[in-house]
Amino acid sequence: FSCSSEDECQFMHAMVADSPLGPFMNPTCFYKRFSIDSHVVETEKGLFLWYSEDNKDCVRIGTRVFVDKLIDPMTPANQPREMIVPTMDEEIFKRGRNGDKDWHTIEGAFWFFEGEWQYVMYSGGCFDNDSYHIGYVAAHSQKSDLTRVQFVKHTNNGKFAPVMYKNDFEEGSGHHSVIKYKGQYYAIYHARDLDCQKRNEFDEARTARVCKLHVNDGVITAERYSDHI
């Protein structure tokens, strides 16, 4: 989890417990810097942590996705590799946020594999408006060391081609998890009804939703409906 204090802004931590019901105790700080959206997976090479942090030493500055090896569940190797970076204006979080530069956001990574392909889905843009979307990168690879896999962002000939984006009934679609049930993939995500009205800037209008995902040979598509799965 990530949390803030007077001197810390969204530093990533982990806690331990003898039961999933808790109590969780003894927090350990993984990174003494902004670090969010942890997603731990296990392969034959061990545990890997997908997460997001900032990079200002680049052309498209902002938040992007990294992966780091975990020595054990409470100890990162602290050798993160940048895996998914902003490449287009549709991934802008806020224009002019950092002086004369636009701030981009790629966050909420979720890794899984199907057949001979590995996928990392992510959320991009700004969660608070209709730019928020879900995209993915894919790799035709059997490598178990996820820091060495070369993922390629899915686009339409280099242009914006998200799996999920605003449609005629919802916006702000993102920050999802993926499950496979009886051979069918599903995305559990949040979004807002397109016609919702916020009472004020602090009103949270997003709700949890489910849709089918179709995953085949490096391509992911979503099947969304307003009234059923």
Which ranges hold each PLM region?
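Carbohydrate-active catalytic/glycan-binding domains of CAZyme proteins
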Residues: 1-229
